[in-house]
Regions:
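Short beta-strand/loop motif that positions the catalytic acidic residue
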Residues: 116-117, 122-129
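Conserved alpha/beta-hydrolase
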Residues: 4-19
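Active-site nucleophile elbow and catalytic-triad environment of alpha/beta-hydrolase enzymes
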Residues: 99-119
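Primarily recognizes the serine-hydrolase "nucleophile elbow" in alpha/beta-hydrolase
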Residues: 37-41, 46-95
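Alpha/beta-hydrolase active-site loop
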Residues: 21-43, 63, 112
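Conserved alpha/beta-hydrolase "acid-adjacent" motif
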Residues: 130-134
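Hydrophobic/aromatic beta-strand patches that form the interior of the parallel beta-sheet core
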Residues: 8, 79, 122-124
Length: 134
């Protein structure tokens, strides 16, 4: 069994102390940059990298792990804390089907991406969480 050990925490643009604005492209770029820092700059092999996402970050994290798996270089594990099935599903749940589909793209279909991930997956989700439905 491979021992996984690497954890890199980052804020997405427009969240926390990070500058910039949050949009799909900036979040995807930050996710890709975080994986590159871990693997290329710090020398962490993908087979020892744990990809972690919390709340809004679970979609980009699942997409990154699916992309790595597609390239036959999956991470060691994927951990999703308070995930959602997709941003569009969340918007539909909160705003209704017509408005949700109109306003929100299907950029991070977490549930669909999980089917493509080829590493162990840990889902952490409270059964009373009314914000992030999974």
């Amino acid at each position: 069994m491979t021992t996984c050990f690497f954890l890199k925490k980052q804020e997405y643009p427009g969240y926390g102390l990070a500058g910039g604005s949050a949009n799909e492209d900036s979040v995807d770029a930050a996710t890709h940059a975080g994986c590159r820092v871990a693997t290329e700059c710090l020398g962490t092999p993908l087979e020892r990298l744990i990809v972690y996402g919390r709340s809004v970050g679970t979609g980009p994290a699942a997409a990154a792990a699916a992309r790595m798996s597609y390239r036959n270089k999956p991470p060691c594990a994927l951990v999703l804390h308070s995930p959602y099935t997709s941003i569009r599903d969340y918007a539909t749940e909160k705003a209704g089907a017509a408005l949700g589909a109109l306003l929100v793209s299907e950029r991070w279909p977490t549930k669909r991406n999980l089917a493509r991930v080829r590493c162990p997956i840990l889902l952490i989700h409270g059964d009373r969480d009314e914000v992030s439905l999974f």
